[in-house]
């Protein structure tokens, strides 16, 4: 258990950050699932719209440091490859 006042404050801060990170990670997964569902339905317009929203979310989270920028690039590339196969 924390002994000093600053250590107690740090515990509170880390709990807040953890909850925020869990929420943001969950939101990110939801956006990715929406794109995958649209791709599986073979709905191009819905997939492109969902991809656009997912891309914004991924970029935002990578800037904030929730995920690494290379992982963000990999994820966007992987999903866009699937969409382009659907278009062609």
UniProtKB/Swiss-Prot annotation:
Write down the InterPro entries for this protein, in alphabetical order: Ribosomal_bS20, Ribosomal_bS20_sf
Q: Which GO terms describe its molecular function?
A: small ribosomal subunit rRNA binding; structural constituent of ribosome
Q: Which SUPFAM superfamilies match?
A: Ribosomal protein S20
The Gene Ontology biological process terms listed for this entry are: translation
Any Pfam family matching the protein: Ribosomal_S20p
Keyword list (alphabetical) reads: Ribonucleoprotein, Ribosomal protein, RNA-binding, rRNA-binding
Q: Which Gene3D superfamilies match?
A: Ribosomal protein S20
Please provide one cellular component term from the Gene Ontology annotations of this protein: cytosol
Taxonomy, superkingdom: Bacteria
Record's function text: Binds directly to 16S ribosomal RNA.
Q: Which family does it belong to?
A: Belongs to the bacterial ribosomal protein bS20 family.
* Protein name, per record: Small ribosomal subunit protein bS20
Organism (species): Blochmanniella floridana
- Per the record, the gene is rpsT
